[in-house]
Amino acid sequence: MRLTVVGNPDNRRVGLFTAAVLAAGLPRPAVLPWADVLTGAAPPPAGALVRVDSPGEDPQVDRLLRRSVASARHGELIGLADTYAGLVDGLARVAAGGAELLNDPADVAALCDKRRCHARLSAAGVPVPAALPSIGGYGELRAAMAEAGWARVFVKPAHGSSAAGVIALAVGPRGVRAVTPIEIAPDGLFNSLRVRCYDDETTVAALVDRLAPEGLHVERWLPKAGLGDRVVDLRVVVVAGQPTHAVVRAATGPLTNLHLGNARGDLAELRAAAGPAAWAAAMQTCVRAAACFPRSLHVGVDLMFLLGWRRHAVAEVNAFGDLLPGVLADGRDTYAEQVHALTSGRWQRWRAATKVLSGAVTGREPVACGT
């Protein structure tokens, strides 16, 4: 077995996967840089087995994806829709040579569009927060919230990642409150590592209106379960249909992403709070979420238990959600687990099984958590 990785050569993701491949006794994978893909390099040929890694964290690649002559400034929220279009085009280029991709381009395209991902999960009966129809700006958002009877929502850029541009918005008799990592500067919007609160409605309205042209996905803000004084959710990595690795994310506010200064929680404590039956049901939901993207070796599922621990919902599914440094299961990290799935035949068996079952998940009634 000879693997190729499409990625940014100096990125730790490529390094961690390469280490896992070598530890399994396989040849060092070839690396095809994203920058080369986007500037016309020949794609991997038929017969190659290709892992496509995140194109993020590289200014040159970001500029190429956006088809821009100018680099984005650090943290700048710019060209999210253009970046998505560039990613979809880049994936098509990678696939053009007939190689077998471990991240199917159609799956990745759906996963990187929160609207399409939510619709696919809902249609398959996976519990997700209820969502509003397309929103063109703040006025439409407030009108849709009023019609739905919702006081709290998450406003998400359709093509954002890592909480970039996300706004947790609450409205009430005393006004509005928006919790977000967005820093508003005179010359643009910037994603920050510090969460901010905005309570001036004019400011909040302008923020939503500036993000809206990139495309927005708006979901009901569901009350999460908590441990101690923090709310919690989970990142669960599903490899070849099996939930193998999980990290608890604990926060004092609504945004739980670890890079925003939040802490890893205690998985054993969370499992004890949920109880065996609720935990098993949640893991089965992660399997069902992954089965919505059956041609992808792995996905990262963001799963939340709701207040009371008896119900749960999937907040997001991530195409490149396997970066969980230091988290081991059966002695393997997420990258070693993926290599094991390939060498053991589990990946091939799961793909065959999902092909058989794919007809069973079509045509089902959408499922959404409304409370």
Could you describe each region identified by the protein language model?
Residues 1-4:
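Extreme N-terminal starter segment of soluble prokaryotic enzymes
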Residues 10-11, 159-162, 223-224, 243, ...:
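Short, solvent-exposed loop/turn segments at secondary-structure junctions
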Residues 258-298, 305-371:
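C-terminal active-site "lid" helix and adjoining low-complexity regulatory extension at the edge
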Residues 93-215:
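Active-site nucleotide/adenylate-binding loops and adjacent lid/helix of ATP-dependent enzymes
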Residues 67-78, 177-190, 259-268:
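A solvent-exposed, charged loop/short amphipathic helix patch at secondary-structure junctions
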Residues 198-309:
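A long amphipathic alpha-helix within ATP-dependent nucleotide-binding catalytic cores
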Residues 8-20, 24-135, 139-143:
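Conserved N-proximal alpha/beta basic substrate-recognition cap immediately N-terminal to
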Residues 155, 165-169, 175-181, 230-250, ...:
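Beta-strand scaffold of nucleotide-dependent catalytic cores
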